[in-house]
A protein has these predicted regions:
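Thiamine diphosphate
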Residues: 1-129
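Conserved thiamine diphosphate
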Residues: 118-152
Length: 152
């Protein structure tokens, strides 16, 4: 078997893998270091006749995803650290309603608004949940770009 090897950034790999997995809608809001996912999908989704919306805020993006997946459409958003913290109430509603929300958290370090370089500080928030209620969500934590593709 002759497989082509491609060198690509993790953000681009996740975006293309989402397309390959049949994602029909992407709702996002730009925040470093995940902005490349939205940039990539802004062109590709249009070419494929799929929906791309740059939301007015992170809260708008996660709520649009919840609306889309509640109708049976494969949809996703991506964000980073402090913006994911803003989404916690919506994520607890998604868990309560058992909605298949896909949220890519390209983490960055630091408390508050943090810094713009990658880190793993949000892992506990993702695993243990930051919203109200006693719930667990499925967390896939890739450690390589290949795993980003395989797990998307």
């Amino acid at each position: 078997m002759n497989e082509e090897k491609v060198l690509v950034k993790g953000n681009y790999a996740i975006a293309q893998a989402a397309i390959n997995a049949g994602c029909q809608c992407y709702f996002g809001y730009p925040i470093t270091p995940q902005t490349e996912i939205g940039e990539y999908l802004s062109g590709k989704m249009q070419e494929l006749g799929r929906a791309y919306v740059c939301a007015e805020s992170e809260l708008g993006a996660i709520n649009m995803v919840m609306g889309a997946v509640s109708t049976g459409v494969k949809a996703m958003t991506s964000s980073s650290s402090c913006a994911v913290a803003l989404m916690q109430e919506a994520l607890s509603y998604a868990a309560s309603d058992e909605l298949p929300v896909v949220l890519v958290n390209v983490m960055r370090t630091g408390p508050g608004l943090g810094y713009i370089y990658p880190a793993q500080g949000d892992y506990n928030q993702a695993v243990y949940g930051g919203g109200n209620g006693d719930y667990k969500i499925i967390v896939l934590a890739p450690s390589t770009v290949q795993e980003c593709v395989d797990l998307t």
